[in-house]
């Protein structure tokens, strides 16, 4: 397949640059993978689409304030976007500057915190903190929320809450698992009251999620690597859910990628997973774990629209996106959602 096959026309005014006033106020497009049928709904209708005994799996990563500003010793300004925290003192990061810093160069961040550039790994820089603070403490003190480029505005105080799920727990992501942004405490409580089971995996979303696909042939694309964990208790819940004939419903493409990474790494029965994954899901992929998913609307020609197309059918998903444009759904991270069931074999 060609990357250009996954394009669609999107008017700029449909890109959501702010969230709705209430998390659950978004719209929900239901795509039935078994029939290809579409239904326009409100997000709160998800309560009618999830059945007692179904297992919903969420990504509990926490977005860190990963964008830093500072200057080199020469006075030249630079911007740092953390890709990954290596430990309490070291990061891998993208650095934007008129001239790239050389190994040993000192960087002075806003707030006076100091870092040095230790090494370069292709497009990423390994930086170490020279203060008595930890990386997380410095990020919390002077970091900015790393809003996606298409939101096209500076981050604001409200983004610290709204570009974050209510169930976040483990710091490390530099982009939100956006399908989860629609859930608030009340709808989670209502799902539990209905008899829906819940579990949590972790995938620390990297800045690579915003990188465009730079090849023409889908098969030639190389995915960026991200750290993920599917714990043993989640595996046990999945096994029990499948044995009972109920569905595993992933909230977000990051949850999908975590679960299918565990399945790919397992020999035979699903096993726990912890480590880096660069799984690339595109049409032709055989899903082993996920039966349905909640997901936002993704960028044209992105690996995420490819993933959804693999799950529910290429023609069905492209048709759903065109319908969403016609019906003026809101797109991308702060936009509306889809509930998608797997296409019948």
Swiss-Prot record:
Gene3D superfamilies: QueA-like (3.40.1780.10). One of its GO terms (biological process) is tRNA wobble guanine modification. It is found in: Cytoplasm. Pathway: tRNA modification; tRNA-queuosine biosynthesis. Keywords: Cytoplasm, Queuosine biosynthesis, S-adenosyl-L-methionine, Transferase. The keyword Cytoplasm applies. One of its GO terms (cellular component) is cytoplasm. Transfers and isomerizes the ribose moiety from AdoMet to the 7-aminomethyl group of 7-deazaguanine (preQ1-tRNA) to give epoxyqueuosine (oQ-tRNA). This is S-adenosylmethionine:tRNA ribosyltransferase-isomerase. It comes from Shewanella amazonensis (strain ATCC BAA-1098 / SB2B).
């Amino acid at each position: 397949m060609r990357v250009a096959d996954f394009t669609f026309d999107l008017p700029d005014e449909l890109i959501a640059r702010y969230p709705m006033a209430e998390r659950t106020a978004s719209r929900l497009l239901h795509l039935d993978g078994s029939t290809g049928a579409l239904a326009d709904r409100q997000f709160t209708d998800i309560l009618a689409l999830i059945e007692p005994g179904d297992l919903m799996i969420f990504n509990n990563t926490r977005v860190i304030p990963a964008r830093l500003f500072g200057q080199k010793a020469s006075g030249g300004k630079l911007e740092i976007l953390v890709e990954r925290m290596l430990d309490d003192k070291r990061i891998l990061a993208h650095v934007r500057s008129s001239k790239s810093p050389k190994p040993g160069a000192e960087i002075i961040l806003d707030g006076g915190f100091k870092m040095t550039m230790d090494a370069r790994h292709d497009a990423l820089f390994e930086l170490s903190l020279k203060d008595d603070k930890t990386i997380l403490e410095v990020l919390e003190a002077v970091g900015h929320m790393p809003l996606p480029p298409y939101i096209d505005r500076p981050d604001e105080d409200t983004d610290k809450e709204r570009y974050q799920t209510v169930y976040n727990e483990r710091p490390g992501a530099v982009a939100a698992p956006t399908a989860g942004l629609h859930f608030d405490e009340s709808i989670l409580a209502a799902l539990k009251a209905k008899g829906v089971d819940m579990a949590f995996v972790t995938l620390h979303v990297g800045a690579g999620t915003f990188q465009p696909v730079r090849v023409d042939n889908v098969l030639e694309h190389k995915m960026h690597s991200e750290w993920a964990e599917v714990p043993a208790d989640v595996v046990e819940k999945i096994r029990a859910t499948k044995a009972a004939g109920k569905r595993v419903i992933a909230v977000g493409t990051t949850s999908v990628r975590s679960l299918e990474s565990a399945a790919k790494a397992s020999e035979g029965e699903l096993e726990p997973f912890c480590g880096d994954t660069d799984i690339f899901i595109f049409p032709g992929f055989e899903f082993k774990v996920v039966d349905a998913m909640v997901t936002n609307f993704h960028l044209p020609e992105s690996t995420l629209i490819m993933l959804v197309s693999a799950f529910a059918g290429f023609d069905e998903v492209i048709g759903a996106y065109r319908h969403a444009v016609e019906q003026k759904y809101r797109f991308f991270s702060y936009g509306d959602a889809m509930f998608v069931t797997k296409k019948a074999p």
